[in-house]
Structures are given as structure tokens and as C-alpha cells.
């Protein structure tokens, strides 16, 4: 059963060097997602909150073929340095993983 990961992040890229580092992350990350059968469904872009008071900054949605594939992505030792870089450049405000159909 597929799973979807949805996250809302606050970026800390006001400094040019941080923006450049985040650009490197954005270029590298899809390779590691794909290694585990994952794909990006959305990555940033315009957001319209239709109901509620949620104020997302940057929303990313990934699809993986299974929870096991998602979990293996999250602990991939090759992805670890990139994950650490992302963590230094952003704060994850919300992250959910849900089963698909």
C-alpha cells in the first residue's frame, strides 16, 4: 500500500550561502527519494488554505510504494549528510505520513 509523506517547513535561507546550500539539497534529494521508489508530488509552490488557520510556508509531498520504503529512505546512510544539511537550513513544523489507497 502506498504512503504519502507531507511536511511543512520553515526555511532559514535569507543568507546567500544558505540559499545556495539549500539549492544543492534540492538538486541532490530526488536521487535518494527515487532509490527507495519514492517520487515528489509537490515541492513548494503556491498554497491556498481553504479551511482553518494553517499558515504553511513550504509544503512538500512525497509518495512511496510502502511504509517500509519510506522508513528505509529516512534512515538511508547515503542520505544522512543531506538530511543533516536540510535540518540545518529548515525547521520542520509538521510532518505526517499517511496510507494511500
Language-model features, listed with the residues they occupy:
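A general structural signal for well-ordered secondary-structure junctions
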Residues: 39, 79-80, 92
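Short S/T/G/P-rich N-terminal loop/turn motif that feeds into the first structured element of a domain
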Residues: 1-58, 65-71, 98-101
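Generic beta-strand structural signal
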Residues: 58-60, 93-94
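C-terminal end-helix/capping segment
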Residues: 87-101
